[in-house]
Amino acid sequence: MGQKVHPIGLRVGIIRDWESKWYAEKDYATLLHEDIKVRKYIETALKDASVSKVEIERAANRVNITIHTAKPGKVIGKGGTEVENLRKYLSELTGKRVHINIIEIKRADLDARLVAENIARQLENRVSFRRAQKQAIQRTIRAGAKGIKTQVSGRLGGADIARAEHYSEGTVPLHTLRADIDYAHAEADTTYGKLGVKVWIYRGEVLPTKKSVEGGK
């Protein structure tokens, strides 16, 4: 089962936290679609800022958005202009006051989303899929990961029949719930069509906090 299920979804409530934190009854579907729009807009507007994830927290008339990025300078902009423009647009989109927090990702090579996007970018620049994966694996292991697995699927090298090739190093224990495994997928647009990129990174074991253990009783 651990091989098929989404590694992050499987660990939510155990060692991972929710990326959207709010409660709603009748408005649940509306707020869910609003979250999707917010995340899509941020991904599009900040596509060159190496954004890993967006956390959304809602209060009565306020929305707190936390952006995890490897390039905080690009998100903030000169004199804070970019982040202010982003805040204004998101305020119009949600109809509420928006507060934006920016958290810098210190080690981008240990973030599955950034590693997957980096491989996808290289594939778009016609780098060999084998070379792109092997270089990413070397950088991630050098950064301190316990294990990594990458997979590229599609018309590899312009072949007529689509296939998938994966490489791995170290261990990636997908069944161990206390294992801190980061997972992400990305897409590369090539002349032969789309290629899918998947990345699993094992960063070591995390013991559940006392709070989460008590909550599960």
UniProtKB/Swiss-Prot annotation:
Residues 38-106 form the KH type-2 domain. GO terms for molecular function: mRNA binding; rRNA binding; structural constituent of ribosome. Pfam families: KH_2, Ribosomal_S3_C. One of its GO terms (cellular component) is cytosolic small ribosomal subunit. PROSITE patterns: KH_TYPE_2, RIBOSOMAL_S3. InterPro entries: KH_dom, KH_dom-like_a/b, KH_dom_type_2, KH_sf_prok-type, Ribosomal_S3_C_sf, Ribosomal_uS3_bac-typ, Ribosomal_uS3_C, Ribosomal_uS3_CS. The keyword Transferase does not apply. Keywords: Ribonucleoprotein, Ribosomal protein, RNA-binding, rRNA-binding. It comes from the Bacteria. SUPFAM superfamilies: Prokaryotic type KH domain (KH-domain type II) (SSF54814), Ribosomal protein S3 C-terminal domain (SSF54821). GO terms for biological process: translation. Binds the lower part of the 30S subunit head. Binds mRNA in the 70S ribosome, positioning it for translation. Belongs to the universal ribosomal protein uS3 family. HAMAP family: Ribosomal_uS3_B. Part of the 30S ribosomal subunit. Forms a tight complex with proteins S10 and S14. This is Small ribosomal subunit protein uS3. It comes from Lysinibacillus sphaericus (strain C3-41). The gene is rpsC.
